[in-house]
Structure formats: structure tokens, C-alpha cells
């Protein structure tokens, strides 16, 4: 089955039909806010969202595109204008998502849409920045979180840590102007010149904040 509007093409099955209207309303309601962040007036092509019925299927698609195994907790990913996302009917069968509720499911599709807009804005992919931004804009974490406790090497070179990446990006967004933030996502040279310093500032910021508490 298929849903289409000016921004999205959604491919889904009969089993998904009962939640699709609400699902797309939520995504549509958040899309302008996300695009505005990247100063995108429109997208070069519609975003195609493919709802996948089984975890094994989405893992195979991920591996075929990225040439690496999928994490056991993977429920969705974006690649350029394509989003692959687990069906809500299958969500609670995926490790670490057994207790996820529909609200979290909605926020995760917004997370993936952030990635699609990020790809549209710039091909540069700095993982901690891009994942942190997707968590921040999709509102998957409490904005009051403040336990920043990751080493510089782990943040920049280790396995993705969504919470720590979120806290890093949160500090940057709340302490720098928008043009500065966007330059981190657009210019590799600019990012390399600033990331080490930004990490040090972030550590100091959260240490000070926690002492005050």
C-alpha cells in the first residue's frame, strides 16, 4: 500500500493501516521545523519511507547498503532519500525495544527524517554530530539530561553513543549561533578546527552544571 504527499512516499502493508494516518500526521507536523533548521525550503526529491515487516529483512537491507552487519537493536536507518523503518507491529520483538511505546516509535521516524535532511544539506557525515542532532531535533531525550561522561576518543572514534552525542550537540546548539552550528555540518575543515575545543568546553560546561546542582 502507498501514501504520498508533497514531501513523502510511504510504502506499507495492510497490517500497518490502522496507525498510518496518525504516523504521517506526526511526521508532517514536524517536517517544517526540521527543514527550517537546515535552511531547506524544499527537498530535491521526495523522501521514500519503507516500512519493513521483519527485523531480519531490515538487517539484510542495511548490510547490502553499508556492507557491514546491523546492530541487534537497529529498527531504522536513512540513506539519502530512502528511509527503512521497522513496522510498529514488529517493534517490540526487537532487542532493547521490547518496552517501547508508540510515542517513541513516532520520534524515531523523525530522527531518521533529520538524517535525510542532513544528507540533503551536506554529504559530510561526522557521526557524533549527526546522531546527536537527530536525537536533539526528534526530542528523543530529556533536555535536562546532563551526565556527559565520555572520552574524546570514544565520542569521535568509538561506537556510536546516542546519549553522549546528544549532550555534545545540545551544548553546541545552546551556546553558539545557528550559522556556526550549520558550518560544523557543512565544512569538514571548520569541524576539524573546532571539535576538540568544543569537546573540552562541553566537559567543563556539564561539570560546572552538575556542581551547581
Locations of regions flagged by a protein language model:
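Acidic/histidine-rich, surface-exposed loop or edge segments in extracytoplasmic proteins
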Residues: 2-19
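Soluble non-cytosolic domains of exported or imported proteins
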Residues: 17-28, 99-104, 108, 124, ...
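Auxiliary, metal-adjacent structural segments of Zn-dependent hydrolase domains
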Residues: 24-82
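Sec-exported extracytoplasmic/periplasmic mature domains
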Residues: 35-39, 114-123, 138-143, 173-177, ...
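Low-complexity, serine/threonine/proline-enriched polar segments
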Residues: 85-89
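Active-site recognition of the HExxH zinc-binding catalytic motif
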Residues: 103, 107-120, 131-135
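Post-HExxH zinc-binding segment in Zn-dependent metallohydrolases
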Residues: 120-161, 209
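Pan-zinc metallopeptidase signature
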Residues: 158-213
Amino acid at each position: 500500500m502507498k501514501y504520498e504527499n508533497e514531501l513523502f512516499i510511504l510504502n506499507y502493508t495492510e497490517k500497518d493501516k490502522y496507525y498510518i494516518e496518525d504516523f504521517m500526521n506526526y511526521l508532517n507536523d514536524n517536517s517544517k521545523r526540521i527543514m527550517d533548521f537546515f535552511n531547506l525550503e524544499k527537498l530535491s526529491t521526495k523522501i521514500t519511507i519503507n516500512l519493513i515487516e521483519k527485523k531480519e529483512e531490515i538487517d539484510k537491507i542495511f548490510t547490502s547498503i553499508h556492507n557491514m552487519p546491523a546492530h541487534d537493536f537497529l529498527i531504522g536507518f536513512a540513506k539519502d532519500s530512502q528511509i527503512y523503518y521497522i513496522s510498529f507491529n514488529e517493534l517490540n520483538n526487537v532487542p532493547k525495544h521490547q518496552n517501547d511505546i508508540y510515542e517513541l516509535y513516532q520520534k524515531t521516524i523523525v530522527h531518521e527524517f533529520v538524517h535525510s535532511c542532513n544528507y540533503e544539506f551536506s554529504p559530510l557525515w561526522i557521526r557524533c554530530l549527526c546522531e546527536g542532532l537527530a536525537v536533539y531535533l526528534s526530542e528523543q531525550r530529556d533536555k535536562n539530561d546532563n551526565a556527559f561522561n565520555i572520552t574524546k576518543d570514544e565520542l569521535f572514534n568509538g561506537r556510536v553513543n546516542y546519549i553522549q552525542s546528544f549532550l555534545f550537540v545540545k551544548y553546541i546548539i545552546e551556546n553558539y549561533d545557528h550559522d556556526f552550528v550549520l558550518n560544523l555540518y557543512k565544512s569538514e575543515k571548520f569541524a576539524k578546527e573546532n571539535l576538540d575545543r568544543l569537546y573540552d568546553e562541553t566537559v567543563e560546561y556539564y561539570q560546572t552544571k552538575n556542581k551547581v546542582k
